[in-house]
Amino acid sequence: MALKYKLILASGSPRRVDLLNQAGIEPSRLMPMDIDEAPKKSEHPRSLARRLSAEKAEAALAAIKGDITWKGSYILSADTVVAVGRRILGKAEFADEALNSLHLLSGRNHMVYTGVCLVTPDRKVRQKIVETKVRFKRLSGFEIENYLASGQWRGKAGAYGIQGLAGTFVQKMVGSYTNVVGLPLYETILLLTGEGFDVHSRWPEG
């Protein structure tokens, strides 16, 4: 079946691509957007996730302006923020940053917020914000040391990916699992189908 609309994913995250693939969606183009992700003064983590997802979508829209190839396409973006209270735990790039985040998360509840933004072919902007409460077990020094050695914390909000080794740290979770991975699948599909993107016709036949 010829599919009418193209989908640009304004992200380079393999996890978000995998989640879309799980739903039978293959993005037509990946466009990682290099924006300033620093929170504003006193900005709530929820507001940060919402703002950054919108800014990524806006940047992608500006990048394809005038390119007839992508005229009439959908643009999807997302941003995930991990926070303990109002303290935002950024993407860990160095081991000491990851260590600090793990000490904060150990034995505590934290929140994972993902803002999802969709720009439609007629350039309407639709957004959803999804939150999940996660509780880590109390981590031993041995667990932290070995997790740091694995390198799985690199580039991840809060220094962990629930789909990897850190999944063994999760004692309890309330809310969407895919939200913690990086793209709340249920809510994303609702956004797409609500704006005329035919998800189910993309499913493979057996």
UniProtKB/Swiss-Prot annotation:
Quote the catalytic residue positions.
D79 (proton acceptor)
CDD domains the UniProt entry points to: Maf
**Swiss-Prot/TrEMBL site (Important for substrate specificity) positions:** R15, T80, Q163
Major subcellular location class: cytoplasm
A GO biological process of this protein is: nucleotide metabolic process
**What keyword terms does UniProt attach to this protein?**
Cytoplasm, Hydrolase, Nucleotide metabolism
Q: What is this protein called?
A: dTTP/UTP pyrophosphatase
Please name the source species: Rhizobium johnstonii (strain DSM 114642 / LMG 32736 / 3841)
